[in-house]
C-alpha cells in the first residue's frame, strides 16, 4: 500500500499536531454533484451503484477531484448488512429504503444469519480495495457501518420511520428479542468493519442516526452498549498505524461523556451541540468531528466563511478537531458553496495550529 501523502485527518483523530484543521463532508459523494447523478444513471439504481466496485470508486473520487478534502469515505449504504441478512432491501421512489421481510418476532431474529463480509458483502470489500488503489496514498479512506440500534430501526419498521412505534413496542414489550437482534447486529458489524479495515479502510465510523430518539437510560442499554461492544472488537492497528474509530449519534450531545468512555478515538457532533462545550467535557479523551449545520451551505460564500470562522474559534487552539457538517450535505446545495466551505476551513484554521 502507498505511503499517505496527507495524513492530517488521521492525525487529528488521534489529537496529534497538524498544520491546519482537516475537513471532509458527510455524503460528500452524492446528489448535489452533477457528475454523481450521471454515474448513478449509468448504474441504473442506487444499490447497483453500491455493488459495482468501479462505479462506487468513481463516485467516491468525484468530490476529491473538485475539492481539497482531507479524506475519502467509502461509497456504500448503512443497510448493506440487513440486506445481506436476507431482508430484501429495495428503494421506493420518494419513500427511501424498504425491506420486503421486516423483523416482526423472535423467530425472525433467531433465523437471521450473520453475513460473511467477504461473501455476501464481498462487493463492499471489492469497492474498498478498488478505492484504495485509486487513491494511491493521496488521502485516507474512511470505512463505516450503521450502529446496531439504527440498523434495527429499519429492520423492524420495514423502512424509514418518524415515530419508531414498532421498534419501541418491541423494546418495551419484548426487550429480550430486541437484545438478541442488537447482539447479532453488533457481531455482524464487528466482522464487517474489520473486513473493511483488512481491505484497506484506514479509519472507521459508526453512524447512530437514530440513537437520539431514545431516553438516556434506553440509549445506554439499547444503543451505546452495543457500540461499545463493537469498539472492543475492532482491529485498531493496521499497515503500521492506528485505525481511529469515530462514533456519531445524531441528537446525542447529552451523552458525550458516556460515548467517550467506550474507548473510541473521536466523536461526531451534530449542529445542536456547542463544540466549545463538547471540548470542555470530553476533549481530553477524544477528538471531535463537526459540526456546521448543513443548511448553512445554502448561504452565500461569505456567510459560509463566517460560520466556519465561528466554529473554529469555538473549538479554539490546538489539536483534535476534524471539521465536518453536523449531518449529510443536502442534495440541492450548489457545488461551489461546498467548495467555499472546504477552502474556508483550510484558509482560516492555520492560526489555531501554530505553536
From Swiss-Prot:
Keyword Zinc attributed: no
Single GO cellular component term: cytosol
SUPFAM superfamilies, sorted: UROD/MetE-like (SSF51726)
Protein name according to UniProt: Uroporphyrinogen decarboxylase
Subunit annotation: Homodimer.
UniProt xrefs under PROSITE patterns: UROD_1, UROD_2
Biochemical pathway: Porphyrin-containing compound metabolism; protoporphyrin-IX biosynthesis; coproporphyrinogen-III from 5-aminolevulinate: step 4/4
UniProt site positions, description: Transition state stabilizer: 77
Enzymatic reactions: uroporphyrinogen III + 4 H(+) = coproporphyrinogen III + 4 CO2
Function in brief: Catalyzes the decarboxylation of four acetate groups of uroporphyrinogen-III to yield coproporphyrinogen-III.
Amino acid at each position: 500500500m502507498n505511503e499517505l501523502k496527507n495524513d492530517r485527518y488521521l492525525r487529528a483523530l488521534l489529537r496529534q499536531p497538524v498544520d491546519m484543521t482537516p475537513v471532509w463532508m458527510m455524503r460528500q459523494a452524492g446528489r448535489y454533484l452533477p457528475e454523481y447523478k450521471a454515474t448513478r444513471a449509468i448504474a441504473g439504481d442506487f444499490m447497483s451503484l453500491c455493488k459495482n466496485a468501479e462505479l462506487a470508486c468513481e463516485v467516491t473520487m468525484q468530490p476529491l477531484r473538485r475539492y481539497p478534502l482531507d479524506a475519502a469515505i467509502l461509497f456504500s449504504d448503512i443497510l448493506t448488512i440487513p440486506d445481506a441478512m436476507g431482508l430484501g432491501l429495495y428503494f421506493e421512489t420518494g419513500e427511501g429504503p424498504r425491506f420486503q421481510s421486516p423483523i416482526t418476532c423472535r423467530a425472525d431474529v433467531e433465523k437471521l444469519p450473520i453475513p460473511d463480509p467477504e461473501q455476501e458483502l464481498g462487493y463492499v470489500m471489492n469497492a474498498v480495495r478498488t478505492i484504495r488503489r485509486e487513491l494511491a496514498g493521496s488521502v485516507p479512506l474512511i470505512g463505516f457501518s450503521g450502529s446496531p440500534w439504527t440498523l434495527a430501526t429499519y429492520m423492524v419498521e420495514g423502512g424509514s420511520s418518524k415515530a419508531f412505534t414498532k421498534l419501541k413496542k418491541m423494546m418495551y414489550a419484548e426487550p429480550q428479542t430486541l437484545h438478541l437482534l442488537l447482539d447479532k447486529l453488533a457481531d455482524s458489524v464487528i466482522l464487517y468493519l474489520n473486513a473493511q479495515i483488512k481491505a484497506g479502510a484506514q479509519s472507521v465510523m459508526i453512524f447512530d442516526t437514530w440513537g437520539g430518539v431514545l431516553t438516556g437510560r434506553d440509549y445506554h442499554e439499547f444503543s451505546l452498549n452495543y457500540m461499545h461492544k463493537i469498539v472492543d472488537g475492532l482491529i485498531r492497528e493496521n499497515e503500521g498505524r492506528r485505525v481511529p474509530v469515530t462514533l456519531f449519534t445524531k441528537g446525542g450531545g447529552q451523552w458525550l461523556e458516556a460515548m467517550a468512555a467506550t474507548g473510541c478515538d473521536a466523536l461526531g457532533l451534530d449542529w445542536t451541540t456547542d463544540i466549545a462545550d463538547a471540548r470542555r467535557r470530553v476533549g481530553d479523551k477524544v477528538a471531535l468531528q463537526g459540526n456546521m449545520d448543513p443548511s448553512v451551505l445554502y448561504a452565500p460564500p461569505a456567510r459560509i466563511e463566517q460560520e466556519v470562522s465561528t466554529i473554529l474559534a469555538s473549538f479554539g487552539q490546538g489539536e483534535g478537531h476534524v471539521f465536518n457538517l453536523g449531518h449529510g450535505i443536502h442534495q440541492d446545495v450548489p457545488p461551489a458553496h461546498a467548495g467555499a466551505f472546504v477552502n474556508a476551513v483550510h484558509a482560516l484554521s492555520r492560526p489555531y495550529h501554530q505553536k
